[in-house]
């Protein structure tokens, strides 16, 4: 939700309050997906729990219309994010299970790009809507979106996932592997820098005088190139290992976040930085998701994706979003974005030195 921070700012919340509220989406990812992931792995009924989580996400969000204080919005956002944060890992697990069964792992990016297309449409439309109708129009648009997600859950065929092995194995031996720890740590460092981006980028641009339409356009540029990289990923994965893709993505992240902080007054540089989103999110996400699927399989696949979401987007995102809010108070927006480039820089060396696997995606 690239404009949610702007809506919260319109309610006269300060940077620390906005950071705390937006970090609820990341904090909920630490524990909520693991509960539903465990239930889904036990039953194999992923679609059933996608329906449940999307239903409660929609119902709870309606409470935002009667909330204008920090405490009230905190309660609504926390309750809603518990369910919405659980939907995506379940959908990822279902998708990867289907692709793995057909030995078409590299096709994941072609499916994921539809989410990016939806983001572009939403970013452009909402930017214009906010310019014309004000920030409050955002909550009506988001309510409609939540309802559509709920309806789409019922279009999915009621298929139960059958695991290739019936033996119940503990997940702890997988979690204790050095390569798994290294992968999750480097992913968390990458997402920490993005936590700052997702929470404060729109506010940063608005404070620099950019219009809602311009902000929407910049977000859309990033996601447009994200779609392009998704289309190219099968070819990229046929030539590079997943580790190489992750390292290249981390390198681009260092450059991107420094540029955002140092040259926010240059639209050309900002566009260049947004183009790098293709690597810092697009290729990085595809490669990390497939490595997680490589380590966590069969009856652990939903929990594997949930743990990935919890540690990277949960812990990592919360550190970046909440910690970023505190840093902005003392260092300012521009300096905080430049400093955030240190996180993927560390992640690069953690991954380079600690991940030894040469695993490549299965192609078909």
Model-inferred region functions:
Residues 1-29, 179-218:
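Helix-loop boundary and gating motifs at the non-cytosolic
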Residues 31-68:
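Conserved MFS/SLC helix-loop-helix module at the cytosolic interface between two early adjacent transmembrane helices
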Residues 48-62, 143, 244-259:
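Structural signature of the two symmetry-related core transmembrane helices
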Residues 65-77, 261-273:
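Helix-loop junctions at membrane interfaces in 12-TM secondary transporters
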Residues 128-145, 326-346:
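A membrane-interface helix-boundary motif in multi-pass transporters
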Residues 154-187:
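Juxtamembrane intracellular "pre-TM" segments in multi-pass secondary transporters
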């Amino acid at each position: 939700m690239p404009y949610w921070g702007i809506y919260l700012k319109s309610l006269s919340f300060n940077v620390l309050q906005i950071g705390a509220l937006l970090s609820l989406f990341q904090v909920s990812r630490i524990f909520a997906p693991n509960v539903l992931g465990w239930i889904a792995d036990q039953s194999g009924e992923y679609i059933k729990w996608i329906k449940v989580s999307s239903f409660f996400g929609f119902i709870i969000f309606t409470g935002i219309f009667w909330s204008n204080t920090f405490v009230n919005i905190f309660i609504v956002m926390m309750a809603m994010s518990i369910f919405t944060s659980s939907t995506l890992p379940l959908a990822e697990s279902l998708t990867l299970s289907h692709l793995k069964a057909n030995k078409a792992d590299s096709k994941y990016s072609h499916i994921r790009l539809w989410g990016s297309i939806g983001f572009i449409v939403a970013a452009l439309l909402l930017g214009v809507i906010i310019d014309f109708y004000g920030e409050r129009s955002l909550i009506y648009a988001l309510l409609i979106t939540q309802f559509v997600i709920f309806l789409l859950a019922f279009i999915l065929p009621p298929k139960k996932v059958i695991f290739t092995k019936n033996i119940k194995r503990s997940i702890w031996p997988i979690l204790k592997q050095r390569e798994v720890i290294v992968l999750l740590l480097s992913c968390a460092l990458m997402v920490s820098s993005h936590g700052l981006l997702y929470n404060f980028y729109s506010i940063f641009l608005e404070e620099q005088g950019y219009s809602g339409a311009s902000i929407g356009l910049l977000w859309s540029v990033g996601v447009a190139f994200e779609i392009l990289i998704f289309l190219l990923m099968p070819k990229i994965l046929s030539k590079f290992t997943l580790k190489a893709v992750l390292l290249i993505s981390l390198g681009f992240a260092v450059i991107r976040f420094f540029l955002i902080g140092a040259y926010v007054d240059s639209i050309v540089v900002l566009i260049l930085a947004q183009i790098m989103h293709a690597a810092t999110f697009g290729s990085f996400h595809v490669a990390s998701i497939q490595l997680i699927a490589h380590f966590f399989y069969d009856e652990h696949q939903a929990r594997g994706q949930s743990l990935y979401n919890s540690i990277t987007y949960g812990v990592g995102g919360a550190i970046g979003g909440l910690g970023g809010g505190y840093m902005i108070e003392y260092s300012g927006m521009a300096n905080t974005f430049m400093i955030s480039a240190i996180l993927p820089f560390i992640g690069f060396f953690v991954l380079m030195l600690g991940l030894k696997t040469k695993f490549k995606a299965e192609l078909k």
